[in-house]
Amino acid sequence: MTESVTSDAEIRSILESETIAVVGCSSTPGKAAHDVPAYLHERGYDVIPVNPFADEIFGRSVPDSLVVVDDEIDVVCVFRPSEEVSDIVEQVLERDDVRAVWTQLGIRDETAAERVLESGREVVQDRCMKVEHRRLVA
């Protein structure tokens, strides 16, 4: 079992980050993968939507993957099925700027989380970033 971030203080610290890349961000209002990043965007976070099937979300162009994101990223928030987390973590590990990986509700991959932790970064699994922001920050 990995030592994912669970304390309120650790989660609050991650939520103090400025730039969040959202892998699997949706352009469809009403979907959690759109509404959660929209909530974060409205609260001043620099949200970088990542989705190979969208051209523009929140008024910005959408890169296909983390590999092609030129901006610095603090946190990678994952809205993809658990079986895709490992590939996303591979992209995270190619970057020096990401301090944490956050998987949304229902998304968990212990092996991928262990790799993130071994690289010296933090992991939050199976938690909604919007819910935690409302609970701890808003």
Please state what every model-predicted region is:
Residues 21, 26-30, 37-58:
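NAD(P)-binding Rossmann-fold cofactor-contacting core
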Residues 45, 96-99, 119-121:
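A short helix->loop->beta-strand "cap" motif at the edges of active sites that frequently abuts
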Residues 1-15, 138:
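Haloarchaeal acidic low-complexity proteome signature biased toward cell-envelope/secretome components but also
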Residues 16-17, 73:
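Phosphate-coordination loops involved in phosphoryl transfer and adenosine-cofactor binding
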Residues 66-106:
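Mid-chain, well-packed structural core segment of small domains
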Residues 105-137:
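Rossmann-fold NAD(P)-binding glycine/threonine-rich loop
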